[in-house]
Amino acid sequence: MSHTILLVQPGARPETRTYCDYESVNECMEGVCKIYEEHLKRRNPNTPTITYDISQLFDFIDTMVDISCMVYQKSTNTYAPYNKDWIKEKIYVLLRQAAFSSNT
């Protein structure tokens, strides 16, 4: 488990910048999914169930002006930066594992 900081800038203005911290990379990726789910709920307030596929999630990530992670590296006692593509790859792996687990 590596402490992970999610840095998000959804809009062009610097005031839209925010961050969240998580105890692990997987927890952070779940957090990104939750951000998207909250976005969908705001856009569709009368829809009782929110569904989406991974391509829609990735499109949402791509609309962000900036989204990146800083992941703690125990060996160097520093945080390493990771970009949108890395985040999408980690989300893909997480969701694939979740789908595999639910099918067994």
UniProtKB/Swiss-Prot annotation:
GO cellular component: nucleus
GO-annotated biological processes: pyrimidine nucleotide biosynthetic process
Post-translational modification: Phosphorylated in vitro by casein kinase II (CK2).
Claim: Signal is one of the keywords in the record: no
Keywords per UniProt: Cell cycle, Phosphoprotein, Pyrimidine biosynthesis
Classification via Pfam families: ER
Alphabetized Gene3D superfamilies for the sequence: Enhancer of rudimentary
Residues with the Phosphoserine modification: 24
Keyword RNA-binding attributed: no
Modified residues (Phosphothreonine): 18
InterPro entries assigned to the protein according to its UniProt record, in alphabetical order: EHR_sf, ERH
Family in the record: Belongs to the E(R) family.
Function (record text): Acts as an enhancer of the rudimentary gene. Has a role in pyrimidine biosynthesis and the cell cycle.
Protein name as annotated: Protein enhancer of rudimentary
Organism: Drosophila melanogaster
Upper lineage: Eukaryota, Metazoa, Ecdysozoa, Arthropoda, Hexapoda
